[in-house]
């Protein structure tokens, strides 16, 4: 099969490409955003017509954290709607047999009953901070369902839980929870051990606002303290700089650490994506309704943020303290997907959170130079 993976440079898209190759697929088509602007309808349609594809996987999207979603809502809804519409409609016009649309668990109402079943879609109000993005993702599901109903296509949708893994975004200001925790604790460990070479390499590869390659150690400490990575002072108020001992460092994280979250390694997500695409159409239709066809992808288990932090602390090898700033809001107390349909369709995750976090940290250290900054 000739498969086009849209968004192959992102965390999810790159994982899908790796998994496809691992499973023996060799005819994989990719285009960078500079080669193909997915918001340009005519260019997308021409590309799909010319390639003669058997399958399209939509892992491309404009994504970002709470601040970005809240600050640029027009960009989030417009770009995501255009990407989805151009690829779905263009695939139909080009006679593409199969398509897989990757959404997000933010499609569900903010006060959904737990665990969240697929049928809870459109049953309540969305989280206001990312509503435009969520509406675009819901539209992607409905595009696939509508084309299936009207044109008899085989376009499928999956909704992953919180993802993490290689090629994630580790920017301190706009990354998701796991990469943010990993990088903060990594930098804290470097301060703890007075490894200024590693700290400056990290800043060079992943810029931090207010810092440059020639910033002094004290300037670095001052800026990192604003990010919650603090070297504590001695009794005489001088910063500890003796390499013969571990410096006393603490990491401050927002909230109580009590919220429960579900985390899925992106390689498991990629495996689930291919599994869903490979399922016979009749078998899939026995589990999903034509107008409620999306499938949750997750682990079926959740964990407190505090427990995740302790695992990361151990994986990184940080000996300092973790402090939770309880004055900051926690957000949703619990967010867990019901994966009953996924399990009945024969798929379960295999990567444990501990193993996944260990692998992700190793990747971060090894590939620091290529970590993307959004």
Where are these regions (language model features)?
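NAD(P)H-binding glycine-rich loop region in Rossmannoid oxidoreductase-like domains
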Residues: 41-81, 93
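Adenosine-cofactor binding site in Rossmann-like domains, unifying the SAM/SAH pocket
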Residues: 21-47
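Short-chain dehydrogenase/reductase
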Residues: 77, 81, 129-141, 171-179, ...
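Conserved Rossmann-fold NAD(P)-dependent oxidoreductase catalytic core, especially the SDR/UDP-sugar
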Residues: 85-130, 156, 169
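Active-site Tyr-X1-5-Lys
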Residues: 86, 128-161, 177-193
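Conserved sequence/active-site signature of Rossmann-fold short-chain dehydrogenase/reductase
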Residues: 39, 105-108, 163-165, 269
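C-terminal substrate-binding subdomain of Rossmann-fold SDR/epimerase-dehydratase oxidoreductases
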Residues: 7-11, 15-23, 186-374
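SDR active-site strand-loop-helix element
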Residues: 6, 31, 56-60, 99-104, ...
């Amino acid at each position: 099969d000739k498969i086009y993976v849209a968004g192959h440079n992102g965390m999810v898209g790159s994982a899908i490409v790796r998994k496809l190759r691992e499973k023996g697929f060799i005819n994989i088509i990719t285009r960078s955003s500079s080669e193909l602007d997915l918001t340009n309808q005519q260019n997308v349609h021409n590309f799909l017509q010319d390639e003669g594809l058997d399958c399209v996987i939509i892992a491309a999207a404009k994504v970002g954290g709470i601040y970005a979603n809240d600050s640029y809502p027009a960009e989030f809804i417009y770009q995501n709607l255009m990407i989805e519409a151009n690829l779905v409609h263009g695939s139909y016009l080009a006679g593409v047999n199969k398509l897989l649309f990757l959404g997000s668990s933010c499609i569900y109402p903010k006060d959904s009953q737990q665990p969240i079943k697929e049928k809870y879609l459109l049953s309540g109000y969305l989280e206001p901070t990312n509503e435009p993005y969520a509406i675009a993702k819901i539209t992607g599901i409905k595009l696939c369902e509508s084309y299936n109903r009207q044109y008899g296509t085989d376009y499928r949708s999956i909704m992953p839980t919180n993802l993490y893994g290689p090629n994630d975004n580790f920017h301190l200001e706009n990354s998701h929870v796991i990469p943010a925790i990993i990088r903060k604790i990594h930098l804290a460990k470097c301060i703890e051990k007075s490894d200024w070479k590693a700290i400056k390499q990290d800043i060079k590869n992943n810029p931090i606002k207010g810092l440059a390659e020639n910033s002094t150690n004290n300037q670095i400490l001052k800026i990192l303290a604003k990010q919650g990575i603090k070297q504590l002072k001695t009794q005489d108020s001088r910063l500890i700089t003796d390499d013969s001992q571990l410096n006393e460092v603490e990491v401050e994280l927002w909230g109580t650490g009590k919220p429960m979250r579900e985390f899925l390694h992106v390689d498991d997500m990629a495996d689930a994506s291919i599994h869903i695409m490979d399922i016979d159409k009749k078998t899939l239709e026995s589990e999903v309704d034509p107008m409620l066809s999306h499938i949750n992808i997750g682990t079926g288990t959740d964990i407190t943020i505090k427990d995740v932090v302790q695992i990361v602390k151990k994986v990184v090898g940080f000996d300092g303290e973790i402090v939770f700033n309880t004055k900051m809001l926690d957000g949703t107390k619990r967010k867990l997907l019901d994966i009953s349909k996924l399990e009945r369709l024969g798929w379960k995750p295999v990567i444990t959170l501990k193993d996944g976090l260990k692998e992700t940290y190793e990747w971060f250290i090894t590939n620091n130079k290529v970590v993307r900054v959004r």
